[in-house]
Amino acid sequence: MKKTIIVAVAALALAHVASAQTNLQMFYDFGRGYATTTLEGFYADNWGDTFFFIDHYYATKADRENTGAGTAINGSYFEIERNLNFWKDSPLADLSLHVEYDGATWGAGVACVGVNYFMHSDDFKNIYNVAVMYDHHIGYGSASVPVKFTGVWGMQDIFGVEGLRFSGFIDIWGLDSQFANPDDILHPYETNLTILSEPQIWYNVGKHIGVENLNVGGEVELSLNFAGNHGFMCNPCIGTKWVF
């Protein structure tokens, strides 16, 4: 999952610098041992903004042979979100209505509705986005507590280094899950909460060679009860990002 472009271009839009951005990220996941790509885009207009991303996972031959067809292996996950804001000239300009759909090739689907709040520093270099939503599971999965919280951040030129960016997101949502208990196969672990965070760091190395589209860096996926894994997991990734 990637949401880091949201606050980056939202700040630019408010600063009247740009209203759209599309980028492609390519990662190697050291924890899982395969590559992923992420295509994401943000587009602002007079009625709010639209954001989407598509993650695709490139499994190895061994992964495919040992994993069922209905899983994320060699599959895709996507989110599309819309913030609706018809009051940009009012004191509530930073508060928007939020609708979202999350889906995957392995059957997962969630529709969300809620509110979104945008915050920024005076120079727009440090930006934050918070959304609280009611989520409804479609087809696959259920939630005793059907609530989702999303926080997104972006910090530009950190440590005074031009072109160095720290960004990321955290998702916390209700999801009823069962995990195998190796000590008691008749009583699996049961959880009702999932957490996923992906802090990223990028450096605009391309500015040194006349290609400012190119960034290098990576991310760390931190999760709790996520993607079939009970408990805490940490998956570091190295990657590149091309901004169109």
Where are these regions (language model features)?
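Cleavable N-terminal export/targeting peptides
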Residues: 1-21
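Outer-membrane beta-barrel transmembrane domain signature
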Residues: 135-215, 221-225, 242-244
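Transmembrane beta-strands of outer-membrane beta-barrel pores
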Residues: 26-32, 45, 56-60, 99-105, ...
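Outer-membrane beta-barrel "beta-signal"
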Residues: 232-244
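Short loop/turn motifs that connect adjacent beta-strands in outer-membrane beta-barrel proteins
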Residues: 20-21, 47-49, 85-96, 120-129, ...
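Transmembrane beta-barrel domains of Gram-negative outer membranes and organellar outer membranes
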Residues: 23-29, 33-90, 94-100
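Membrane-embedded beta-strands of outer-membrane beta-barrel proteins
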Residues: 39, 80, 113-115, 149-153, ...
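Solvent-exposed loop/turn segments connecting transmembrane beta-strands
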Residues: 29-35, 60-74, 101-111, 136-145, ...
